[in-house]
Amino acid sequence: MIDKLGDFKRDYFCGELTENNIGDEVRLLGWADSVRDHGGVIFINLRDKEGIIQVVIDPSKSPKEAYEKAKKVRSEYVLAVRGRVQRRPAGTENPKLPTGTIEIAVDELRILNTCDILPFPIEDGISAHEEVRLRYRFLDIRRPEMMKKLILRHEVYQATREYLAGHGFLEVETPMLTKSTPEGARDFLVPARLEKGKFYALPQSPQLFKQILMVSGIDRYFQIVKCFRDEDLRKDRQPEFTQIDFEMSFVDEEDVITVSEGLIHYIFKKVLGIELKLPFKRMSYTEAIERYGTDKPDLRYSLELKDITDIAKDVQFKVFKDTVEKGGIVKGINVKGGSKFSRKEIDDLTEEAKKYGAKGMAWIKINEDGSLQSPIVKFFTEEQINKIKEIMEGENGDLLIFIADSYEITHRVLGFLRKHLAEKLKLIPENVWEFVWVVDFPLVEWDEEEGRLVALHHPFTSPKEEDIDRLDEAIQDKKVALSFRSRAYDLVLNGEEIGGGSIRIHSSHIQKKVFELLGISDEEAEEKFGFLINALKYGAPPHGGLAFGLDRIVALMTGSESIRDVIAFPKTQKGICPLTDAPDFVQEDQLEELGIEVNIPEETV
């Protein structure tokens, strides 16, 4: 028999009660986290979003009706409890619970709902498959660790709004149904019923609208906004994700960076109680690539890349010598204490290198007694070995590993190996927050597949001022274009990009030239971006901004392995929602109304 809630009102959340409440009569609502019968006395751990408290139904003290109902309670039954807060008997305290020194002596118990057999226990550290957790997400979220993550996410929202509103930003919404302007990832398309054959697109970002808001005189805009990208998914990707997006007029890079650092500092202080040191570190894109093998460097550990190209060009080891003669480079990493690696471990490391594009991996062990062990050491003079050891800071007990290839492949492979080694050797400290701004990015890069230059960030990023006057030259010579640097900046935290932005192009004339540089014709530019180009003609102020990946920030703040763990209802890596079975087929009459025919290749049916 299910009881009615009626006029029963909660006084406290379970986790809010303390010893100061001893003697108080309280009313609580929640779920039965666990039920135990000890010699006829029934103990129920009652749970809500704030925590757990023990309630006691003693047949010698509680009303008979309450006791009879308590005997029927099972895990995850929904309960209303009225009783008095009392101190737990000495020796029965539970130090694992914040409420572990008190309990509720029950005077009234209502069973508001029952619960079917659970697919997994409602507790932290479960081993249930992720797809099962997502199918029963309403149960998964009840688990304390999931609840805490969503509460923290809410607190990040609140802190963001407090900080930005306090610094003169206006929260302005931009459209969810907009024009398809595919640059990079695919758009999610929405058919327009009233304009058959035409489609809206869900926005990949509010980029163009926030620039137009600057033209509109808003001056400082922000939004916590959903964005959509139809791309292949990884652990840090979702088809729909949330950005903290802002834009400012009459600013340069320093202004945007100052606001960004202030916001992150405020969020960490308000939500985690952590005082971050400002300003954050900075390094150029080139420095990041050449020291760490990536434009998202993790500064929590060393393992820096060292360049031995000047030595390699003169050695007898053919792989090194030939690579340098062909314009390549030779770089390495000193794995401190790595001489203890077995040959199998080194072979495994070589296979890791090959996964990321290396043809092989050379290595030299410096044994504890100073002797060298390596199949390549015979090709080096003693002077060359000593010089390599000096550059690599090699000492007894170290393992030196080398990659010889093109500039791009060498850095990419060593960047991945650096991360792999840090994880293998447990070099990554916990509870350390290493922020770094990466600046001075190339404006463009060459895309082999498309056979044209593409924007490294997006086509609305301004070149450095010294490069603007050379745009005509760059349009004629891609080598000149590849030397251009942009006014872009990315913020990296512990090896993860958490935000990126730039100073934008605010001149329609320069914007058209950048489109031309990227191989976008006047007709294509007008078709895709005509509304922006037109707006830039009407007194657009200099402006810039940034977008933070909110999901990624919350994942890092909570120590989550995937952003799926900090999103209430995420998609799987295949873009499926197991809870609702979306995406799904729709009815034929819905398609007819839209004027759409679906052609599904046979192999996908």
UniProtKB/Swiss-Prot annotation:
GO terms for cellular component: cytoplasm. L-aspartate binds at E183, R229, H457, R504. GO terms for biological process: aspartyl-tRNA aminoacylation. It catalyses: tRNA(Asx) + L-aspartate + ATP = L-aspartyl-tRNA(Asx) + AMP + diphosphate. It is found in: Cytoplasm. It is an enzyme of class 6 (ligase). Homodimer. Belongs to the class-II aminoacyl-tRNA synthetase family. Type 1 subfamily. Aspartyl-tRNA synthetase with relaxed tRNA specificity since it is able to aspartylate not only its cognate tRNA(Asp) but also tRNA(Asn). Reaction proceeds in two steps: L-aspartate is first activated by ATP to form Asp-AMP and then transferred to the acceptor end of tRNA(Asp/Asn). This is Aspartate--tRNA(Asp/Asn) ligase.
